[in-house]
Structure formats: structure tokens, C-alpha cells
């Protein structure tokens, strides 16, 4: 495990995790639901007790989850990380590397289904030097926007994953003091005006400056690590996502409505991890989901901001203990 203490984080990442990434992680591409190329990363554990498929959040990319992936691997899991379309090295429907754009969240859902069908499941049966994975439990770990996508996927395909961990899931968006009617009216206005691949008002291109205080991280060292990866010349701007198109924003509102409409399909065990100081997603919506679906457990982290995995100390220690205790119930079943 990467040390939880902030002062030990960077040395450990430099001397242990970065070399491990070079030796154990490989990447590739596969055709998404529409044939567009989607990027992924994988780390195959030689003695796995389960498989974890990871979905990142809005404007996320692989480098932001190096620590999470390493810790999951060290705990005995094989990891498959999907870089969602319009993020990282995956297909971009618009020219700006800073803009996240999608027509409908079902595109994400079907990309995940394609990922499972073409990479994850075949990978387990075609690799002769690894044990037979077909009997291993399959888990889903998803953060924020990934949590919304995961929930939609689990509603549409309820029999694939044994259990899911939703970390600060975007069950609804936190709009602060802005009333929902005004949000919906603005979304309708952008549609009537034909604003599709234009930024949502108030958002724009990545400016190359750090904004730690406004970020979802509470550990400066962890924030700085992923921010440096955003700036890395070798990434050629692939990690500079910074805002959404109006089309993506409308799609997100539709996805949230659909999520609630189909919630009765959520029957598999769910672990909802809630950040007490979250200003990005709506905690009350997470509470409601916990109350309205079967087999849902919610654990709150009072001092955490949106990215609980970018906390430190006791909060981060609790985060991983809760996740592994939950997954181990089904990995050992």
C-alpha cells in the first residue's frame, strides 16, 4: 500500500509505484460501441482473487488513479482501467482537448459493455500463463461521473458484476444555490440555440494553472502529483480536460433522470462512499439511493472532499479498509 501520510507519498510514488507501473501495466485500444477507438490500461495479478474494472470521473485520466490502481493490485486484484471517450487517449468527438463531450451517457454504458466483451472477459480465458479467470468475481469501482455511468450500466446489465463500489457517485449534481428549474431552463435554452459543442457558460479551456483549493482533493501532495501529469509534455495535451460541452451537460441531466427511473433494477451489493465536504455531487441523492435500493451500504467520510482517494492519513486509511472489507466478502465467497 502507498503510505497514507502526505509527506511519504511522493517518495513512495517515485521509488516504488512509478517503476511498478512500467513493469506491470500495459495499455491498448478497442473499438467502442460505434467503432471509435477507446483506450484502456490493465494490470494482471499473477494470483488474483478477483477483477476490478475502474471508471474515472469527469475530466479524469489514468494518471490520477496510479495510487488507487497500485493499492488494488497489491491487495490481490487484477485491474482494468477504462479511459472514457472524450478523455485521455480515447476518441474525441470535438477538436478541443480541454472539452468533454458526449451525446448520451448510454454511449459510455455501451463502451463499457464492449470493453468487457472484447478485452476483460476474453483476456481471462486466452492467457495461458495465468489461472482460469472465468470463476473469479468481477467488481466495478467508479468515481463521480463514473459512478453515474456505473449505475446506469448495472441497471441495464444487472448480471455481470458481483458487486460495485461507488466513490462520490454522481447520482445527482450539486448545483449549490441554483434551483433545478433554472438549471433545466438553461439546458433547454442551449438546445434551442443549437449550442452543442460550445462550453457550458463559465467553463473553458485548460489554462495550465493549479487550483488546489477549488479542487476535489484535500491532500496537496496527491493533487500536485496528478497535476504534473496533466502538464507532462509526453501526454501531448491528452490529460487537459477542463470543462463540458453544452451537449454533455444536457446528457448528464438526462442520465440522472434515467438513473432514478430504473433504480429498481439495482439488486447487486453496492458500497456508496460519501465525501462529507463534497461540493461537486449531491450527498442527499446518495442518501436517497442508499434508502431506496436493496443491498446498498453507505459509508460517510466527514472530512473528505469530493476525491476521497486524494485524502490523506486516517481518512485514506479508512477508505481502503472499507473498500477491501466489502470486496473481500464476495472475493472469498
Regions from the language model: what does each represent?
Residues 57-60:
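Active-site glycine-rich loops that stabilize anionic/oxyanionic intermediates
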Residues 145, 149-240:
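Alpha/beta-hydrolase-fold enzymes
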Residues 266, 272-274, 278:
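Short beta-strand/loop motif that positions the catalytic acidic residue
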Residues 100-126:
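Alpha/beta-hydrolase active-site loop
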Residues 1-31, 37-44:
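An N-terminal hydrophobic leader/cap segment in hydrolases
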Residues 268, 282-291:
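Short alpha-helix in the alpha/beta-hydrolase fold that links the catalytic acid
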Residues 297, 302-333:
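Catalytic active-site module of serine/aspartate enzymes centered on a nucleophile-bearing elbow/loop
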Residues 62, 69-95:
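Conserved alpha/beta-hydrolase
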Amino acid at each position: 500500500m502507498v503510505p497514507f501520510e502526505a509527506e511519504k507519498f511522493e517518495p513512495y510514488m517515485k521509488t516504488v509505484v512509478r517503476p511498478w507501473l512500467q513493469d506491470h501495466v500495459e495499455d491498448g485500444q478497442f473499438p467502442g460501441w460505434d467503432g471509435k477507438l477507446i483506450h484502456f490500461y490493465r494490470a494482471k495479478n499473477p494470483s488474483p482473487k478477483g477483477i476490478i474494472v475502474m471508471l474515472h470521473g469527469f475530466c479524469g485520466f489514468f494518471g490520477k488513479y496510479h495510487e488507487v490502481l497500485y493499492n488494488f493490485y497489491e491487495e490481490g486484484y487484477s485491474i482494468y482501467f477504462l479511459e472514457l471517450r472524450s478523455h485521455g487517449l480515447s476518441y474525441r468527438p470535438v477538436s478541443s482537448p480541454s472539452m468533454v463531450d458526449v451525446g448520451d451517457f448510454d454511449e459510455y454504458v455501451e463502451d463499457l459493455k464492449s470493453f468487457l466483451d472484447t478485452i476483460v472477459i476474453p483476456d481471462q480465458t486466452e492467457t495461458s500463463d495465468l489461472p482460469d479467470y472465468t470463476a473469479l468475481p468481477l467488481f466495478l469501482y467508479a468515481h463521480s461521473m463514473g459512478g453515474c455511468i456505473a449505475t446506469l450500466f448495472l441497471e441495464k446489465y444487472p448480471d455481470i458484476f458481483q458487486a460495485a463500489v461507488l466513490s462520490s457517485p454522481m447520482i445527482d449534481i450539486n448545483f449549490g444555490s441554483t434551483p433545478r428549474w433554472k438549471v433545466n431552463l438553461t439546458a433547454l435554452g442551449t438546445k434551442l440555440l443549437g449550442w452543442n459543442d460550445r462550453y457550458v457558460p463559465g467553463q473553458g479551456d485548460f489554462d495550465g494553472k493549479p487550483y488546489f483549493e477549488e479542487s476535489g482533493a484535500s491532500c496537496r501532495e496527491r493533487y500536485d502529483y496528478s497535476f504534473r501529469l496533466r502538464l507532462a509534455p509526453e501526454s501531448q495535451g491528452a490529460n487537459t480536460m477542463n470543462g463540458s460541452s453544452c451537449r454533455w451537460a444536457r446528457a448528464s441531466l438526462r442520465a440522472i433522470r434515467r438513473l432514478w427511473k430504473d433504480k429498481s433494477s439495482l439488486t447487486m451489493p453496492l458500497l456508496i462512499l460519501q465525501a462529507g465536504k463534497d461540493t461537486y455531487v449531491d450527498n442527499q441523492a446518495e442518501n436517497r439511493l442508499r434508502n431506496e435500493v436493496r443491498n446498498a451500504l453507505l459509508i460517510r467520510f466527514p472530512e473528505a472532499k469530493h476525491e476521497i482517494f486524494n485524502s490523506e492519513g486516517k481518512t485514506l486509511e479508512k477508505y481502503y479498509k472499507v473498500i477491501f472489507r466489502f470486496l473481500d466478502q464476495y472475493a472469498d465467497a
